[in-house]
Amino acid sequence: MKFVLLFGVLLVTLFSYSSAEMLDDFDQADEDELLSLIEKEEARKDCIPKHHECTSNKHGCCRGHLFKYECQCTTVVTQSREETERCFCGTPPHHKAAELVVGFGKKIFG
């Protein structure tokens, strides 16, 4: 009888320890996931929207429907005949074509 009682106490102790470890792992995973979501949300707030200037931050454009917008630059001649580079976030032509094909496919195949 003492052996069964000792074995039962040992089994309950091991079970509670293993379940506590599993809960700690789940809590850590939840915290990591929450921090990841917060970081992504902050990155979205800091990104440059479509058609806005990205001359100083060429890699900071936001995401579009399917692709991330790209910083597209052009050379502008000012009234004083100086050439300056102006950049804006936009969708490149090959991304526009891909979005058109995907949209067309969604309309046909539902």
From Swiss-Prot:
Report the GO molecular function annotations. toxin activity
Propeptide found at: 21-44
Residues making up the signal peptide according to the UniProt record: 1-20
Instruction: Specify where it is mainly localized.
Output: secreted
Please give the tissue specificity annotation from the record for this chain: Expressed by the venom gland.
Tell me which InterPro entries the record gives: Spider_toxin_CSTX_knottin (IPR019553), Spider_toxin_CSTX_Knottin_CS (IPR011142)
State the compartments where it is located: Secreted
GO CC aspect terms:
extracellular region
Where does the source fall among the domains of life? Eukaryota
UniProt keyword terms in alphabetical order? Disulfide bond, Knottin, Secreted, Signal, Toxin
Q: Which cysteines are joined by disulfide bonds?
A: 47-62, 54-71, 61-89, 73-87
Family, similarity comment = Belongs to the neurotoxin 19 (CSTX) family. 03 subfamily.
Could you tell me what this protein is called?
U1-lycotoxin-Ls1cc
